[in-house]
C-alpha cells in the first residue's frame, strides 16, 4: 500500500487490489467531518451510538471521538472491517484532540474497549456475515470501498441489516450517490436525500423510517 497526502493535508492509503484510496483526494479529514460527523448530526447528539461499515484508517472514528471529547459526552462506536490494518499503520498522527485516546485504544484492539470517553467495538469480517445488534445506532457511517469495486457491501441485504441495527430516526451518511445504492437504501427502509458536498458530486443521506 502507498501513503498519499490529500488536499487538506491529511494522509490516506492507496489500496492496490481495489485500486482506490481509502479517502477522496480532496481530504480525508474534511470528508470525515462534513459528511459523516455533521451529515449524520452526530456532532449535536447528546450520546451518539455510531455504526461504521469500513473502519479503514480510523479517521471517521478519530474525528467523532474528538467531537465527543470536546463536548464532554460519551461515545459508543461499533465498526465493521473486513481487512483490518496493522496497529503500526493506524498509529499515524492527525493533530486531533483524540490522537492520544486513539493510540491507547490501538493497544487494546480488537476489543471491545471500555474507556472514560465511552465504548468501542471492532467486528472483523464481511459485513454480510457479521452479527450486528438490533436498534443500536443513532448514526450509520457507510464507508466501504466504492460500489464499483466492492458492490457486495452496498447490496440490499446489507442495507436491510443496517436498518435493523438503526434506531428509528437514525441518520445514515455515505459518499456514494449511485442510483442503485439510493434505491437499495429506500427499499431497506431509509428516507433518502442528497447531501450537499463542497466538491463536485453530492453525497447521500438517509433517515431510518419506523417499521
Regions found by a protein language model. Give the residues of each.
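Class I SAM-dependent methyltransferase Rossmann-like catalytic core
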Residues: 1-47, 57-70
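A conserved beta-strand element that flanks and buttresses the S-adenosyl-L-methionine
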Residues: 141
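Glycine-rich, N-terminal phosphate-binding loop of Rossmann-like dinucleotide-binding domains
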Residues: 144
